[in-house]
C-alpha cells in the first residue's frame, strides 16, 4: 500500500535475509565435517512439529488478529524457525518475518477457532477482519493517480472515485479538523500530547455504548467491523498515518508490544478515515457487505462530529514544552 506521508519505505527482498547456505570448501569431506547448524542447507535441518513449507497458505498472526497469508521463505536461524510471509491482498511492503508460534495451518478447524474468538471466517481473509468474499489486487486498468508528497496526509481526497468500491464523505467540520491538524503538526511544529484520553479503544467503546443506548443492542457485524477498524489502525498508523516529525514521538510512546490504539486518539483515527477508501480498493465485497460497511463508516464519522469538542484536543503543544514537562 502506498504511503505518501510515512517515512521512506524499503521493499526488502528475501535475499536480504537469506544468505548462501552452501560452503565453499575444497572437498565433500570438509563440507560435511567442518560446518555448524547455521551453515547447513535448509533441507538437512530437522523440521519441528507444525513446520510450514514455502508456498504454503497459512493463517498468520499480526496485532492480535489472524490474516490469510502465504509463506514465501523459510529460515532456520538462532536455533529457531522463521517464516517470511506475504499477507494475501496486501502490498508487498507489508511482508515480514514471523516466528512459528505466529502461524496456523489454513484449515477449517483453525478458521472455526478464530470464529469462536470473534473473527468470522470471511473476516480472516480481510486485512481488517471484515466479511468479504475474497481479496484481489487492483485491476491493472485502474489508475494509481499522481504521486503525492512524502510529508502529507491527503485531506482533500475524502470521496472515493467512481471506479472504486467505497464512497463516503467526511463532514465539513471534520475536514476542517484535519486541516487544522495538518497546520499544527507540519507548519507550527506542534504535536498532540500522548497518551491521548480517550484513546482509539475508548472512542470505539463510547461508540458501542451510544449504539446500545440508541438501539438497545449491538449487532455482531458491527462488533466485527469495529474490531477490524482497531486492528487496521494499529497496523496502518506507523506506515501511513504519521507526519515525519511525529515519528520520534511514536518511537518513544509505542514500544514493548503496546498497541497504537491505546496511545493515540481521535486525531489519528480521523486520518485513517481519509485513507480507508484508498486502502479498501483492494477488497472485493458483496454489495450488501459494502453498503453495511459504508453505512457504519458514515455513522462513526457522525459520532465523531457530534462529540468533536470532547474527543479531539483543543490545543497542540510544542515538542520542547512536552519534554520540559516530562523532565
Curated annotation (Swiss-Prot):
Q: Which keywords accompany this UniProt record?
A: Chromatin regulator, Nucleus, Transcription, Transcription regulation
Matching entries from InterPro entries are given as: Agenet_dom_plant, Chromo-like_dom_sf, Chromo/chromo_shadow_dom, MRG, MRG_C_sf, MRG_dom, MSL3_chromo-like
What name does the UniProt record give this protein?
Protein MRG2
Question: What residue stretches are annotated with the Tudor-knot domain?
Answer: 52-101
Any one cellular component term from GO for this entry? Answer: nucleus
Gene3D superfamilies on file: 2.30.30.140, MRG domain (1.10.274.30)
State the residue spans of region: Disordered. Answer: 1-40, 133-156
Give the tissue specificity: Ubiquitous. Mainly expressed in the vasculature of cotyledons and leaves, and in roots and inflorescences.
Say yes or no: keyword DNA damage present: no
Amino acid at each position: 500500500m502506498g504511503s505518501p506521508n510515512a517515512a521512506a519505505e524499503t521493499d526488502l527482498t528475501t535475499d536480504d535475509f537469506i544468505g548462501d547456505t552452501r560452503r565453499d570448501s575444497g572437498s565433500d569431506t570438509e563440507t560435511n565435517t567442518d560446518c555448524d547448524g547455521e551453515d547447513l542447507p535448509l533441507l538437512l535441518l530437522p523440521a519441528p512439529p507444525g513446520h510450514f513449507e514455502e508456498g504454503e497458505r497459512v493463517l498468520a498472526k499480526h496485532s492480535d488478529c489472524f490474516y490469510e497469508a502465504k509463506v514465501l521463505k523459510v529460515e532456520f536461524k538462532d536455533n529457531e524457525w522463521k517464516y517470511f510471509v506475504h499477507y494475501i491482498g496486501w502490498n508487498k511492503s507489508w511482508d515480514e518475518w514471523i516466528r512459528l508460534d505466529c502461524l496456523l495451518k489454513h484449515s477449517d478447524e483453525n478458521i472455526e477457532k478464530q470464529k469462536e474468538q470473534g473473527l468470522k471466517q470471511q473476516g480472516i481473509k480481510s486485512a481488517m477482519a471484515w466479511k468479504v468474499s475474497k481479496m484481489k489486487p487492483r485491476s491493472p486498468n485502474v489508475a494509481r493517480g499522481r504521486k503525492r508528497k512524502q510529508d502529507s496526509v491527503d485531506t482533500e481526497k475524502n470521496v472515493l472515485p467512481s471506479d472504486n468500491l467505497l464512497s463516503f464523505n467526511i463532514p465539513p467540520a471534520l475536514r476542517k479538523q484535519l486541516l487544522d491538524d495538518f497546520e499544527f503538526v507540519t507548519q507550527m511544529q506542534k504535536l498532540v500530547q500522548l497518551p491521548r484520553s480517550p484513546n482509539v479503544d475508548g472512542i470505539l467503546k463510547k461508540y458501542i455504548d451510544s449504539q446500545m443506548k440508541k438501539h438497545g443492542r449491538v449487532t455482531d457485524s458491527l462488533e466485527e467491523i469495529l474490531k477490524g477498524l482497531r486492528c487496521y489502525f494499529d497496523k496502518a498508523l506507523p506506515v501511513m498515518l504519521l507526519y515525519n516529525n511525529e515519528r520520534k514521538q511514536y518511537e518513544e510512546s509505542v514500544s514493548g508490544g503496546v498497541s497504537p490504539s491505546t496511545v493515540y486518539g481521535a486525531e489519528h483515527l480521523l486520518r485513517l478515515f481519509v485513507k480507508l477508501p484508498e486502502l479498501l480498493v483492494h477488497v472485493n465485497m458483496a454489495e450488501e457487505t459494502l453498503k453495511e460497511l459504508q453505512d457504519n463508516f458514515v455513522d462513526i464519522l457522525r459520532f465523531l462530529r457530534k462529540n468533536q469538542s470532547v474527543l479531539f484536543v483543543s490545543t497542540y503543544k510544542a515538542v520542547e514544552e512536552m519534554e520540559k514537562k516530562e523532565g
